Amino acid sequence: MACGPGDLQSLTSPLSSARLDYQPSIEGPWLRACGQTNVSCRVVKGKLVEVGKWPWQVSILFLGTYICSGSLIHHQWVLTAAHCLQRFKDLSLYSVMVGVHQRPENSTQLPLTRMVIHKDFSNLMSQDIALLKLRDSISWSPFVQPVCLPNIKFKPSIGSMCWVIGWGTTGKKG
């Protein structure tokens, strides 16, 4: 793990050909573009951890309990997996927590106003994608920032380094 005090690590943004229907808001010197991390090291329970490595990661809650992760793509929109939302469509049962690192003390829990599940999603995990709209627009901070979305023609080459993030299990129990 390579941690420096507040190191800003730049990731390439594949958004150059994307069309925006709003004027992006740059709210601080630490937000130059999507996909930016603002890593700092902290000791949590005796272990060195990187805080701010994935500032777009959010926790999706069902009745206040974690069920899935998602990614901030806009001030009011979260991208997630459709299978996380397939059992219940009642928005009042869900919320999103932003700014979560190890513990939720410094995070903000937000209600939703809309859920969009891909029209061709099935339990077979085909088209497993959904969007959640937050009731209120959030402000970017060093630890709450948007992820980049790839260009529609983007196709990673075999052997490309990819990251999967979340708070789920990493293997089967037992």
Curated annotation (Swiss-Prot):
PROSITE patterns to which the protein is assigned, alphabetical: TRYPSIN_DOM, TRYPSIN_HIS
Residue ranges occupied by any Peptidase S1 domain in the UniProt entry: 43-174
Annotated GO biological process: proteolysis
Disulfide bond annotation, renumbered to this chain: 68-84
GO molecular function: serine-type endopeptidase activity
SMART domains xref list: Tryp_SPc (SM00020)
Pfam short name (any one): Trypsin
Keyword entries, A-Z: Disulfide bond, Hydrolase, Protease, Serine protease
Protein name: Putative serine protease 46
